[in-house]
Design a protein with these regions (language model features):
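Conserved ABC transporter NBD signature motif
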Residues: 64-72
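Conserved ABC ATPase signature
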Residues: 146-150, 154
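Conserved catalytic motifs of ABC-family nucleotide-binding domains
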Residues: 167
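Conserved ABC ATPase "signature" region
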Residues: 72, 123-141, 250
Length: 281
Protein backbone atom coordinates (compact mmCIF):
# COMPACT_ATOMS: atom_id res chain seq x y z
CA UNK A 1 0.00 0.00 0.00
CA UNK A 2 1.39 3.40 -1.00
CA UNK A 3 1.92 5.91 1.80
CA UNK A 4 0.34 9.12 0.55
CA UNK A 5 1.35 12.26 2.41
CA UNK A 6 -0.95 14.50 0.34
CA UNK A 7 -4.35 13.71 -1.18
CA UNK A 8 -6.13 16.31 -3.30
CA UNK A 9 -9.69 15.48 -4.34
CA UNK A 10 -11.98 17.46 -6.66
CA UNK A 11 -10.16 20.71 -5.90
CA UNK A 12 -11.81 23.73 -7.50
CA UNK A 13 -10.96 27.42 -7.21
CA UNK A 14 -13.13 30.08 -8.74
CA UNK A 15 -12.57 33.83 -8.92
CA UNK A 16 -15.00 36.62 -9.64
CA UNK A 17 -13.70 38.85 -12.44
CA UNK A 18 -15.85 41.81 -13.46
CA UNK A 19 -18.96 40.08 -12.29
CA UNK A 20 -18.17 36.80 -14.04
CA UNK A 21 -16.98 33.56 -12.49
CA UNK A 22 -13.61 32.32 -13.75
CA UNK A 23 -12.53 28.78 -12.86
CA UNK A 24 -8.77 28.75 -12.29
CA UNK A 25 -8.65 25.18 -10.94
CA UNK A 26 -11.28 22.78 -12.24
CA UNK A 27 -11.99 19.56 -10.30
CA UNK A 28 -8.34 18.59 -9.82
CA UNK A 29 -7.42 15.34 -8.04
CA UNK A 30 -3.99 13.83 -7.37
CA UNK A 31 -1.89 12.27 -4.63
CA UNK A 32 1.71 12.79 -3.57
CA UNK A 33 3.51 9.77 -2.16
CA UNK A 34 5.69 10.24 0.90
CA UNK A 35 9.31 10.86 -0.06
CA UNK A 36 8.65 11.44 -3.76
CA UNK A 37 8.84 14.52 -5.95
CA UNK A 38 5.68 15.16 -7.97
CA UNK A 39 6.00 17.68 -10.77
CA UNK A 40 3.00 19.86 -11.65
CA UNK A 41 3.67 21.23 -15.13
CA UNK A 42 1.77 23.58 -17.40
CA UNK A 43 1.91 26.86 -19.28
CA UNK A 44 1.20 30.23 -17.68
CA UNK A 45 -2.45 30.41 -16.66
CA UNK A 46 -2.86 26.64 -16.43
CA UNK A 47 -3.81 26.83 -12.75
CA UNK A 48 -0.75 25.10 -11.33
CA UNK A 49 0.32 27.91 -8.97
CA UNK A 50 -3.26 28.44 -7.80
CA UNK A 51 -3.41 24.71 -7.05
CA UNK A 52 -0.22 24.99 -5.01
CA UNK A 53 -1.58 27.90 -3.01
CA UNK A 54 -4.83 26.07 -2.32
CA UNK A 55 -2.86 23.04 -1.12
CA UNK A 56 -1.15 25.23 1.49
CA UNK A 57 -4.28 27.28 2.19
CA UNK A 58 -2.59 30.49 1.17
CA UNK A 59 -5.86 30.94 -0.69
CA UNK A 60 -9.07 29.10 0.13
CA UNK A 61 -10.44 26.47 -2.26
CA UNK A 62 -13.97 27.01 -3.54
CA UNK A 63 -14.68 23.27 -3.35
CA UNK A 64 -12.85 20.02 -2.76
CA UNK A 65 -10.66 18.51 -0.08
CA UNK A 66 -6.94 18.56 0.63
CA UNK A 67 -5.69 15.97 3.13
CA UNK A 68 -2.21 15.83 4.59
CA UNK A 69 -1.43 12.68 6.56
CA UNK A 70 -5.14 11.88 6.40
CA UNK A 71 -6.32 15.19 7.91
CA UNK A 72 -8.49 17.52 5.82
CA UNK A 73 -6.60 20.81 6.04
CA UNK A 74 -9.46 22.82 4.52
CA UNK A 75 -11.29 22.54 7.85
CA UNK A 76 -8.37 23.45 10.13
CA UNK A 77 -8.57 26.51 12.35
CA UNK A 78 -6.16 28.45 14.59
CA UNK A 79 -3.70 26.15 16.39
CA UNK A 80 -4.29 23.18 14.10
CA UNK A 81 -3.73 25.37 11.03
CA UNK A 82 -0.57 26.81 12.60
CA UNK A 83 0.75 23.29 13.22
CA UNK A 84 -0.01 22.36 9.61
CA UNK A 85 2.04 25.31 8.36
CA UNK A 86 5.08 23.90 10.17
CA UNK A 87 4.67 20.60 8.31
CA UNK A 88 4.17 22.10 4.86
CA UNK A 89 6.20 25.03 3.54
CA UNK A 90 6.56 26.88 0.25
CA UNK A 91 9.54 28.07 -1.76
CA UNK A 92 8.40 30.97 -3.94
CA UNK A 93 9.25 31.76 -7.54
CA UNK A 94 10.76 35.23 -7.22
CA UNK A 95 13.80 35.32 -4.91
CA UNK A 96 13.82 39.13 -5.09
CA UNK A 97 10.29 39.89 -3.86
CA UNK A 98 9.89 36.92 -1.49
CA UNK A 99 12.54 38.19 0.97
CA UNK A 100 11.99 41.30 3.11
CA UNK A 101 14.77 43.69 2.00
CA UNK A 102 14.92 45.23 5.49
CA UNK A 103 15.59 41.97 7.32
CA UNK A 104 18.98 40.34 7.72
CA UNK A 105 19.47 36.69 6.83
CA UNK A 106 19.39 35.54 10.44
CA UNK A 107 16.05 37.32 10.97
CA UNK A 108 14.53 35.91 7.77
CA UNK A 109 15.38 32.32 8.65
CA UNK A 110 14.61 32.71 12.37
CA UNK A 111 11.11 34.07 11.76
CA UNK A 112 9.47 30.66 11.37
CA UNK A 113 11.39 29.23 14.32
CA UNK A 114 10.21 32.09 16.55
CA UNK A 115 6.59 31.54 15.51
CA UNK A 116 6.55 27.78 16.07
CA UNK A 117 9.09 27.55 18.91
CA UNK A 118 8.85 30.87 20.76
CA UNK A 119 10.80 29.60 23.77
CA UNK A 120 13.87 28.51 21.81
CA UNK A 121 17.08 30.05 23.14
CA UNK A 122 18.87 32.58 20.94
CA UNK A 123 22.05 30.51 20.91
CA UNK A 124 20.15 27.40 19.80
CA UNK A 125 18.37 29.32 17.05
CA UNK A 126 21.65 30.80 15.80
CA UNK A 127 23.27 27.36 15.69
CA UNK A 128 20.33 25.99 13.70
CA UNK A 129 20.48 28.89 11.24
CA UNK A 130 24.21 28.40 10.69
CA UNK A 131 23.61 24.71 10.02
CA UNK A 132 20.82 25.53 7.56
CA UNK A 133 23.03 27.99 5.70
CA UNK A 134 25.62 25.27 5.26
CA UNK A 135 22.95 22.81 4.10
CA UNK A 136 21.86 25.16 1.30
CA UNK A 137 25.40 26.08 0.28
CA UNK A 138 25.87 29.43 2.05
CA UNK A 139 28.36 30.49 4.72
CA UNK A 140 27.99 31.48 8.39
CA UNK A 141 29.36 34.95 7.64
CA UNK A 142 26.23 35.59 5.55
CA UNK A 143 24.14 35.75 8.73
CA UNK A 144 24.04 39.52 9.14
CA UNK A 145 23.80 40.57 5.51
CA UNK A 146 20.73 42.01 3.83
CA UNK A 147 19.15 40.35 0.75
CA UNK A 148 20.52 43.09 -1.52
CA UNK A 149 24.02 41.68 -0.95
CA UNK A 150 23.15 38.40 -2.69
CA UNK A 151 22.62 37.15 -6.22
CA UNK A 152 19.31 35.64 -7.33
CA UNK A 153 20.55 32.10 -6.81
CA UNK A 154 21.85 32.93 -3.33
CA UNK A 155 18.56 34.58 -2.41
CA UNK A 156 16.70 31.46 -3.47
CA UNK A 157 18.99 29.43 -1.22
CA UNK A 158 18.01 31.74 1.65
CA UNK A 159 14.36 31.15 0.80
CA UNK A 160 14.94 27.39 0.89
CA UNK A 161 16.70 27.67 4.26
CA UNK A 162 13.75 29.69 5.59
CA UNK A 163 11.35 26.94 4.49
CA UNK A 164 13.52 24.22 6.06
CA UNK A 165 13.81 26.06 9.40
CA UNK A 166 10.57 24.55 10.76
CA UNK A 167 11.46 21.00 9.65
CA UNK A 168 8.61 20.48 7.18
CA UNK A 169 7.59 17.12 5.73
CA UNK A 170 6.29 18.66 2.50
CA UNK A 171 7.93 21.37 0.41
CA UNK A 172 5.78 23.06 -2.23
CA UNK A 173 8.07 24.71 -4.77
CA UNK A 174 6.34 27.27 -7.00
CA UNK A 175 8.59 27.58 -10.07
CA UNK A 176 11.63 28.17 -7.84
CA UNK A 177 14.14 28.27 -10.71
CA UNK A 178 12.10 30.15 -13.32
CA UNK A 179 13.73 33.52 -12.51
CA UNK A 180 17.30 32.19 -12.44
CA UNK A 181 20.04 31.82 -15.06
CA UNK A 182 20.29 28.36 -16.63
CA UNK A 183 23.57 27.49 -14.88
CA UNK A 184 22.11 28.50 -11.51
CA UNK A 185 18.91 26.58 -12.22
CA UNK A 186 20.89 23.34 -12.38
CA UNK A 187 22.54 24.07 -9.03
CA UNK A 188 19.21 24.74 -7.30
CA UNK A 189 17.62 21.63 -8.83
CA UNK A 190 20.56 19.58 -7.58
CA UNK A 191 20.04 21.09 -4.12
CA UNK A 192 16.39 20.01 -4.10
CA UNK A 193 17.45 16.51 -5.17
CA UNK A 194 19.96 16.39 -2.32
CA UNK A 195 17.42 17.64 0.24
CA UNK A 196 14.93 15.03 -0.91
CA UNK A 197 17.51 12.28 -0.47
CA UNK A 198 19.13 13.40 2.79
CA UNK A 199 16.18 14.88 4.69
CA UNK A 200 13.39 12.64 3.42
CA UNK A 201 11.45 15.59 2.05
CA UNK A 202 8.41 15.22 -0.14
CA UNK A 203 8.24 17.76 -2.99
CA UNK A 204 5.35 19.20 -4.97
CA UNK A 205 7.34 20.94 -7.69
CA UNK A 206 5.64 23.48 -9.96
CA UNK A 207 7.19 24.21 -13.37
CA UNK A 208 6.13 25.56 -16.76
CA UNK A 209 8.05 23.03 -18.85
CA UNK A 210 8.96 19.37 -18.71
CA UNK A 211 12.70 20.00 -19.06
CA UNK A 212 12.85 21.50 -15.55
CA UNK A 213 11.37 18.45 -13.82
CA UNK A 214 12.97 15.80 -16.01
CA UNK A 215 15.71 14.71 -13.60
CA UNK A 216 14.11 15.74 -10.29
CA UNK A 217 10.57 14.39 -10.25
CA UNK A 218 9.46 10.78 -9.87
CA UNK A 219 6.01 11.45 -11.31
CA UNK A 220 4.60 14.33 -13.34
CA UNK A 221 1.09 15.78 -13.66
CA UNK A 222 0.39 17.96 -16.69
CA UNK A 223 -2.13 20.81 -16.31
CA UNK A 224 -3.92 22.85 -18.94
CA UNK A 225 -6.76 25.33 -18.49
CA UNK A 226 -7.22 24.44 -14.84
CA UNK A 227 -7.46 20.66 -15.29
CA UNK A 228 -5.00 17.77 -15.14
CA UNK A 229 -4.62 16.30 -18.63
CA UNK A 230 -2.26 13.46 -17.81
CA UNK A 231 -0.37 12.07 -14.84
CA UNK A 232 2.21 9.31 -14.74
CA UNK A 233 5.77 8.36 -13.97
CA UNK A 234 8.57 10.37 -15.50
CA UNK A 235 9.39 7.48 -17.82
CA UNK A 236 5.77 7.09 -18.97
CA UNK A 237 5.36 10.75 -19.83
CA UNK A 238 8.68 11.08 -21.63
CA UNK A 239 8.54 7.85 -23.61
CA UNK A 240 4.82 7.40 -24.25
CA UNK A 241 2.78 10.58 -23.64
CA UNK A 242 -0.93 10.05 -24.30
CA UNK A 243 -2.45 13.53 -24.24
CA UNK A 244 -1.79 15.84 -27.24
CA UNK A 245 -0.88 18.70 -24.91
CA UNK A 246 1.69 16.54 -23.13
CA UNK A 247 3.06 15.54 -26.52
CA UNK A 248 3.50 19.21 -27.43
CA UNK A 249 5.37 19.86 -24.18
CA UNK A 250 7.64 16.88 -24.85
CA UNK A 251 8.35 18.18 -28.36
CA UNK A 252 9.40 21.52 -26.88
CA UNK A 253 12.03 19.99 -24.56
CA UNK A 254 15.51 20.89 -25.89
CA UNK A 255 17.60 17.90 -26.94
CA UNK A 256 21.29 18.25 -25.91
CA UNK A 257 22.35 15.84 -28.67
CA UNK A 258 22.11 17.74 -32.01
CA UNK A 259 21.86 14.53 -34.04
CA UNK A 260 18.95 13.33 -31.90
CA UNK A 261 17.35 16.78 -32.11
CA UNK A 262 17.48 16.63 -35.92
CA UNK A 263 15.97 13.13 -35.84
CA UNK A 264 13.10 14.34 -33.64
CA UNK A 265 12.54 17.36 -35.89
CA UNK A 266 12.45 15.17 -39.00
CA UNK A 267 9.98 12.81 -37.32
CA UNK A 268 7.71 15.71 -36.31
CA UNK A 269 7.76 17.10 -39.85
CA UNK A 270 6.97 13.69 -41.31
CA UNK A 271 4.06 13.25 -38.89
CA UNK A 272 2.72 16.71 -39.77
CA UNK A 273 3.02 15.97 -43.50
CA UNK A 274 1.20 12.67 -43.03
CA UNK A 275 -1.70 14.44 -41.30
CA UNK A 276 -1.93 16.96 -44.13
CA UNK A 277 -1.93 14.17 -46.72
CA UNK A 278 -4.58 12.27 -44.76
CA UNK A 279 -6.79 15.35 -44.64
CA UNK A 280 -6.39 15.96 -48.37
CA UNK A 281 -7.41 12.40 -49.12
Amino acid sequence: MTDDILEVEHLTREFSVRGETVTAVDDVSFTVHRGEALGLVGESGSGKSTTARCVLRLIEPTRGTVRMNGVDITTLRRRALKDFRARAQMVFQDPYSSLDPRMRVREIIAEGIRIHRPRAKDSVVTDEIVELLEVVGLRPDHLDRLPAAFSGGERQRIGIARALAVNPELLVCDEPVASLDVSIQAQILNLFQELKATRGLTLLFIAHDLATVRHLCDRVAVMQQGAIREIGTREQLYTNPQDPYTQSLIAAVPEPNPIEERRKLTARRAAAAAKVAEGAA
